[in-house]
Structure formats: C-alpha cells, structure tokens
Amino acid sequence: MRTGRISRKTKETDIQLELNLDGKGVADISTGLGFFDHMLASFSRHSEFDLKVRAEGDLYVDEHHLVEDVGIVLGRALAEVLGDMSGIARFGEARIPMDEALAEVALDVGGRNYLVLKAEFASPQVGQFSTQLVRHFFETLASNAKITMHASVYGDNDHHKIEALFKAFAYAMKRAVKIEGKEVKSTKGTL
C-alpha cells in the first residue's frame, strides 16, 4: 500500500497527516477552518485517497500559517509516498463543473515543481478562508510534492470556483498516480 505519515510542529502550527493513495476516499479532517476542512475532505473523496489531518495553528493571527503548513505537509506526504514515481501514469488532467463554475487542472507528477493558476475571486473570504490562500496553498503543495500544476477556473460564486478547483485537482491526481506498470515514465529513465 502507498501510505505515509508526516508531522510538522513549529511555533505557529502543529500538524499530523496520514495519507493512503490506495484508499476509498475516507476523510478525517480537523483544521479549525470549516471551509478548508470541506475542501480537503472533497479532495480526499474525489481522489479516493484516504486522508487524515489534525492541524492546530495560530488562527488568532489569521489562517495563513495553518493553510500554508498543511500544503507543506500534504506535499511532502505525496512526495514520500510516490518515491521515485516508478509505475505511475505521471500525467493527469480533469475538467470539473460546479453549477456555473468550471475548473481545469493538468498535472505532471514528475519531480519538477511549478504552478500556473488562472483564478480570480470577487470576495476576500469564503467563511474564514481567505481567497488569497487558494494560490498559496497550491503553490506550497506543488513545491513540496514536486509536481507541475496548471489550473484555471471561472464562474460567479467563489465557493463553487474553489471547490471545483479542489475537485479537479483530486481527479487529476487520481489519474496521475494510477499504477500503469513498473517503469518510470521518462525518456531519461528517472525523474
């Protein structure tokens, strides 16, 4: 089974995360940020990765440190579980609608980190979650997971746009980490 556990404790946050890429989409999430919990649970459900997150942080300051550090830990867990990336499909993409919103995500799980995100939000926050943190979360995750991610979303409702992005990311990841053999998908023979 492709599973991992990662912890991170700083003066700002304390995070424990468990990940199973070959799970059933079971989520057990507690970050103290309801909307963020909902997005992580949605990612778990639609990727079919089992995901357990226990995160505490200095929310009295704001949610930035907590969201950033969850991105770090989830990215590191993905990198650890995938190892040298032997046998995985490597590439994944998805187009996911949510009512008036449409999100597209294309991934290369190939050891090089980069994010291109085309997204505009009308509201500064959804619940207690700053819409500025959507980009920061995915940048941090991509950097630590060593994945390249191109994503775009349009729509009218910021909740729908963000949720469609998380779901599209989930389906793209599910496809990219699918086992398709034993070889590394690279002409170099390594990633």
UniProtKB/Swiss-Prot annotation:
InterPro entries: IGPD_sf, ImidazoleglycerolP_deHydtase, ImidazoleglycerP_deHydtase_CS, Ribosomal_Su5_D2-typ_SF. It is an enzyme of class 4 (lyase). SUPFAM superfamilies: Ribosomal protein S5 domain 2-like. One of its GO terms (molecular function) is imidazoleglycerol-phosphate dehydratase activity. Pathway: Amino-acid biosynthesis; L-histidine biosynthesis; L-histidine from 5-phospho-alpha-D-ribose 1-diphosphate: step 6/9. Keywords: Amino-acid biosynthesis, Cytoplasm, Histidine biosynthesis, Lyase. It is found in: Cytoplasm. GO terms for biological process: L-histidine biosynthetic process. One of its GO terms (cellular component) is cytoplasm. Pfam families: IGPD. It catalyses: D-erythro-1-(imidazol-4-yl)glycerol 3-phosphate = 3-(imidazol-4-yl)-2-oxopropyl phosphate + H2O. Belongs to the imidazoleglycerol-phosphate dehydratase family. This is Imidazoleglycerol-phosphate dehydratase. The gene is hisB.
